[in-house]
Amino acid sequence: VSEEYEKNTLIKLSKMGSSSKLCLYGKLKNNCQSEEYLNCNNFIHRQLLSKFRLSDHSLGIELGRYRNIPRAQRLCKKCEVLDDEYHFFLYCDINISLRSNLFAYLKDYVPLFQHLDAFNKLKHILNPIPELVCHIGVFIKQSLELRESDPCQARL
């Protein structure tokens, strides 16, 4: 029974469209096992990772959903491109320095990290091995703080 449930759950997750709230989660989740990052002792880091995995965050892609803003118009106020998880973790100008530090650390644990495509980089960030949870949690927390303090990021 549990094997059938797992199979059906994974099929449903993999079929979620790009407009679905759980689209990213469906791409990240490839089994029904508990994720290793959930064993992290730091509640804040666990919570931040969970929120980004489940698209329960303050990025434009999510805030715009609740305000019925068309997806293509849910832009980062600083960079004027789609404000989604890819942009936040991999490209946003507001956290370049933080990202550089995180990526330097990641390449010590993930061979050839810098050569991965965007999805696989994001997958390693949002499906971290236990040694990386703290560093990724700090990156998320500090990046969100930078966004909140930046006048360009003021939300309507």
Listing of model-derived features with the role each one plays in the protein:
Residues 1:
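Negatively charged
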Residues 6-156:
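Family-specific functional microsites
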